[in-house]
C-alpha cells in the first residue's frame, strides 16, 4: 500500500560549458522528483528533467497528481494504470494548463515513473526484468492510448507484442552483451575546438563508435569547422550526429543542412521548432538521404503520431522524463514499431531509466539496436549510476528503475 507521497526539487549546476547548446547556454541540470513510500519500506523514485528554473512548479503539480495514488496498492494500481494515468491527465483544472504538455505533463511523468519504480522494487526486480515478465495484455493495461486510435488501438498494440513474443529468445542475448552507447558530450556548444579534439580522442579511447556535436551558431562556418574536426578525428567508420537544438528557421535549416553533406551525419537533430511538423516534413524531403532525429521536446504521443504520419522522422527521440513517463514512452515505442521508425531516446535521465526501456523495446517489440545516449555529468549524484564500459551500457541488476538520487 502506498502510504506517503512527497517531492524533491534537485538542481545541479554543471558549469564549464557542459550541457550547453545553441538555445540553452548555461543549463542547470535538475529534477522534479516524486517519492512514493509503501508500507513495506520501499520507496519509488520518479524523475522529470528540467534545466533549473521552474522545477518547483513541476514539483507542486506532481504533489497534486501523487495524491491520486496514495492509499492504493501498487499491484492493483498498475494492473490498470492506463486508466489511472488518463484520469490524472484529464483532471479538469490542471488539464487546462496543458493539455498533455508543459509543467503538468512533466509532473505526470515524475509520478508515473515513481509508480513504475515502486512496482519493480516491490517485486525485487530491475525494471527491464519486470517489463519482460509482464504479459502483453498486462503491458497494454498500463498504457493510455487515447487519441491514437486512428493508428494504434489496444488490439493492434497487443498484436505487436504477441507477434514478437515467440522470437524474444533470439534477442535476449543483448542482456549479456549490453546495449551500445554514444557519447553526446564530445562537442557541447560552448566547447572550444581544442577541447572538442581532446574529447573525440577520449571518446574513441573509451570505445564509443558514435558521437554528437552541438551546432546552431550565428556563424554556420563555425559549425562546419567543428563538424569537420569531429569527422577528421573520428574517421569514416564512426557515426557522427549533428544537433541544432531548434535554433534554425526552416529556410536556414534547408541551407545549413546542405553544408553538412560531406560530413555524412548519421542524423541531424532538432533542426527547428518542435511543434512545426510541416517544417520538418519540408526539410526532411529537401535534404535526403540525410535523416532527421526529433523528439527531445515533443511532449506527448499525439504529436509523435503526427510526425510519424508525416513521414519526416528518421529517428524518434522520445524521452520518458518529458512525456508522461514510462507508460507513454511505451505507447510511443509501439506506435513507432507500427511505422517502422527506430526509437533512440533522448536521456534527460542521463540514461538511468532508459537503459531499462531500450532493452524492453528490442526484446519485446523487435526494435533495432542502434545506441543509447550517454551523458556523464550527473553520475556521482545517483545511488546506482549507469555502468558504461567500452562504449556499452551494462545491464543493471539492482531492483527498480535506477533513478534513486543521493
State each model region's role:
Residues 77, 127-130, 214, 267-271, ...:
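Flexible, glycine/charged-enriched surface loops at secondary-structure junctions
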Residues 145-282:
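Metal-dependent enolase-superfamily TIM-barrel catalytic cores that perform enediolate-based chemistry
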Amino acid at each position: 500500500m502506498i502510504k506517503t507521497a512527497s517531492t524533491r526539487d534537485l538542481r545541479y549546476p554543471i558549469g564549464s560549458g557542459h550541457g550547453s547548446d545553441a538555445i540553452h547556454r548555461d543549463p542547470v541540470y535538475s529534477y522534479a522528483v516524486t517519492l512514493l513510500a509503501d508500507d513495506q519500506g520501499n520507496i519509488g523514485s520518479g524523475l522529470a528533467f528540467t534545466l533549473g528554473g521552474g522545477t518547483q512548479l513541476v514539483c507542486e503539480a506532481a504533489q497534486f497528481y501523487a495524491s491520486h495514488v496514495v492509499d492504493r496498492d501498487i499491484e492493483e494500481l498498475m494492473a490498470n494504470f492506463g486508466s489511472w494515468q488518463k484520469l490524472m491527465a484529464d483532471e479538469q483544472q490542471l488539464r487546462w494548463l496543458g493539455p498533455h504538455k508543459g509543467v503538468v505533463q512533466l509532473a505526470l511523468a515524475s509520478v508515473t515513473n515513481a509508480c513504475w519504480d515502486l512496482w519493480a522494487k516491490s517485486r525485487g526486480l530491475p525494471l527491464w526484468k519486470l517489463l519482460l515478465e509482464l504479459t502483453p495484455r498486462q503491458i497494454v493495461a498500463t498504457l493510455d492510448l487515447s487519441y491514437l486510435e486512428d493508428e494504434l488501438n489496444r488490439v493492434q498494440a497487443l498484436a505487436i507484442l504477441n507477434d514478437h513474443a515467440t522470437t524474444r529468445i533470439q534477442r535476449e542475448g543483448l542482456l549479456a552483451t549490453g546495449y551500445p552507447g554514444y557519447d553526446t558530450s564530445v562537442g557541447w556548444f560552448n566547447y572550444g575546438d581544442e577541447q572538442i579534439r581532446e574529447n573525440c580522442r577520449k571518446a574513441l579511447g573509451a570505445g564509443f563508435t558514435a558521437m554528437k556535436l552541438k551546432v546552431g551558431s550565428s556563424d554556420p562556418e563555425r559549425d562546419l569547422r567543428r563538424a569537420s574536426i569531429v569527422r577528421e578525428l573520428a574517421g569514416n567508420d564512426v557515426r557522427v550526429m549533428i544537433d541544432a537544438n531548434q535554433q534554425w528557421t526552416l529556410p536556414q535549416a534547408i541551407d545549413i543542412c546542405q553544408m553538412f553533406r560531406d560530413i555524412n551525419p548519421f542524423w541531424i537533430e532538432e533542426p527547428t521548432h518542435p511543434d512545426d511538423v510541416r517544417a520538418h516534413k519540408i526539410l526532411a524531403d529537401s535534404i535526403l538521404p540525410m535523416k532527421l532525429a526529433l523528439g527531445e521536446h515533443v511532449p506527448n504521443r499525439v504529436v509523435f503520431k503526427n510526425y510519424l504520419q508525416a513521414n519526416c522522422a528518421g529517428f524518434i527521440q522520445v524521452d520518458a522524463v518529458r512525456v508522461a513517463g514510462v507508460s507513454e514512452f511505451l505507447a510511443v515505442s509501439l506506435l513507432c514499431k507500427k511505422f517502422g521508425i527506430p526509437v533512440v531516446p533522448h536521456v534527460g535521465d542521463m540514461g538511468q531509466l532508459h537503459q531499462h526501456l531500450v532493452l524492453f523495446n528490442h526484446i519485446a517489440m523487435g526494435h533495432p539496436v542502434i545506441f543509447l545516449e550517454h551523458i556523464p555529468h550527473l553520475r556521482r549524484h545517483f545511488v546506482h549510476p549507469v555502468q558504461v564500459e567500452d562504449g556499452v551500457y551494462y545491464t543493471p541488476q539492482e531492483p527498480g528503475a535506477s533513478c534513486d538520487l543521493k
